[in-house]
């Protein structure tokens, strides 16, 4: 069994240093791995990333993370990633990594994802070059998920870590008019094709906790949704089959 502590939209800053450091100090005894689903900082400033880096530096369990839209706002996303990587965080950007956790081979595919909407209201590949580039960017994110899942196909457990939502079910609760900005069902296509045991994302602060891609569970782990610093998932499985238990808050 692997215990996964997941959180999205931590929005670290100097103002939240105490809460962030306390949350990470407590979680080590409750989890085997930590997954962070983007919006690691408030506005993407390196000084804000340093707060999270300080909290992660002495963590003895693996920490995986993807960036979110807030982490790009200041134009310093590369610096944010570098600071966290220097502190030992496995930063995933259209990439995948495998590691041994609790006696099992865990594979994590991580990328930010992007916008585009869901059936009934989607951005088409049509019109001005800027709009078509948005469509193309989401396609590149989906392609990265597919490639990552190919790379971790032999892992005992496979997780997809995103910021933007791949299903509309987990953004329900947000105004319908902004669903197109909260994710894209195109991100779900490679997950449905190649399979995964668990999909995690954030971004939709007023969204819903649970959805599915076929039989694959999808969870919105934004702290505003879970109401806790971390949510613990218990995964038990063997290659080709797994069971996910939602243990609860930590």
What are these model-derived regions, one by one?
Residues 1-62, 72-79, 131, 135-138, ...:
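N-terminal active-site segment of His-dependent metallophosphoesterases
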Residues 10-12, 78-179, 222-224, 235-237:
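Conserved catalytic scaffold of divalent metal-dependent phosphoesterases
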Residues 6-8, 34-39, 63-69, 90-95, ...:
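Active-site neighborhood of phospho(di)ester-bond hydrolases with catalytic His/Asp-centered motifs
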Residues 11-16, 41-46, 70-80, 98-101, ...:
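Active-site environment of divalent metal-dependent phosphoester hydrolases
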Residues 2, 32, 106-108, 157-159, ...:
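Alpha/beta-hydrolase fold active-site loops
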Residues 59, 87, 214-216:
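Short, structured coil segments at secondary-structure junctions
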Residues 1, 78, 99-102, 172, ...:
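Binuclear metal-dependent phosphoesterase catalytic core
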């Amino acid at each position: 069994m692997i215990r996964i502590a997941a959180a999205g939209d931590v929005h670290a800053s100097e103002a939240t240093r105490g809460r962030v450091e306390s949350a990470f100090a407590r979680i080590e005894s409750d989890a085997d791995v930590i997954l962070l689903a983007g919006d690691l900082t408030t506005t993407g400033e390196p000084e804000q990333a340093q707060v999270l880096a300080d909290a992660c530096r002495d963590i003895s369990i693996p920490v995986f993370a993807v960036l979110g839209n807030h982490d790009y706002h200041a134009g310093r996303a590369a610096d944010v990633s570098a600071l966290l990587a220097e502190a030992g965080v496995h930063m995933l950007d259209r990439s995948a990594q495998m590691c041994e956790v609790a006696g099992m081979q865990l594979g994590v595919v991580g990328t930010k994802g992007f916008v585009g909407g869901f059936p009934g209201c989607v951005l088409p590949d049509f019109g001005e070059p800027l709009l078509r580039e948005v469509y193309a960017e989401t396609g590149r994110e989906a392609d990265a998920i597919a490639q990552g899942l190919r790379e971790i196909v032999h892992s005992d457990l496979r997780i997809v870590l995103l910021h933007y939502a791949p299903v509309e079910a987990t953004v329900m609760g947000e105004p319908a008019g902004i669903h197109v900005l909260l994710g894209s069902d195109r991100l779900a296509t490679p997950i449905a094709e190649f399979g995964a045991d668990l999909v995690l994302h954030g971004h939709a602060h007023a969204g819903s906790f649970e959805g599915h891609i076929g039989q694959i569970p999808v969870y919105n782990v934004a702290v505003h949704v879970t109401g806790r610093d971390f949510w613990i998932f218990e995964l038990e499985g063997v290659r080709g089959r797994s069971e996910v238990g939602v243990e609860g808050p930590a």
